[in-house]
Amino acid sequence: DMELGIETKIEGEIAERGIIALDAKIFSEIVRKLPDNDITIETDDNYTSTITCEKSKFNIAGKSGDDFSYLPVIIKEKSISLSQFTLKETINQTIFCTSPNDNNKMMTGELFEVKDNVLKVVGLDGHRIAIRNINLSGNADDVKVVVPGKTLNEISKILSSDAESVVNIYFTNNHILFEFDNTMVVSRLIEGEYF
């Protein structure tokens, strides 16, 4: 949606290369409810995809993937690494303090500030504040950005609870990139000065 993009690469047996754009919400709902078994996806010339798994079969109307907007290329300069479990836990402990409405855009996001090898995550809605500090290893560059709450909610759904699995976070002036397993999540940052 130009604010948030998620890309995941999975291994599969490809009979014929192709590209199609499907409604992400519908596709993920179908896949989430399928049994844990092999899934077959077939697409016809009218951009209708048939998803089959065991006795389940679904048809989804799609459109040409040629016009699909891909994730922006992020220059990986400023970065930090931490466990997926730690990031997931941090989001869950702070996200409730973000504002659900857009009256004050800044309060719909969380501050991610890296200073002196500590990541400080702050959620604030005008009535409550949640702060979490995480010690980082290595030499992290100082960073101060505001990440949309919507992005953090989506990330917390797909992060592993495994303390051994790592997430790399890259910062630019306009975007943040979360990279873990075979997944990349890119989000625009909220512009402005956090309180």
Set out the residue ranges of the language-model regions:
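Structural preference for solvent-exposed beta-strand-turn elements
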Residues: 1-195
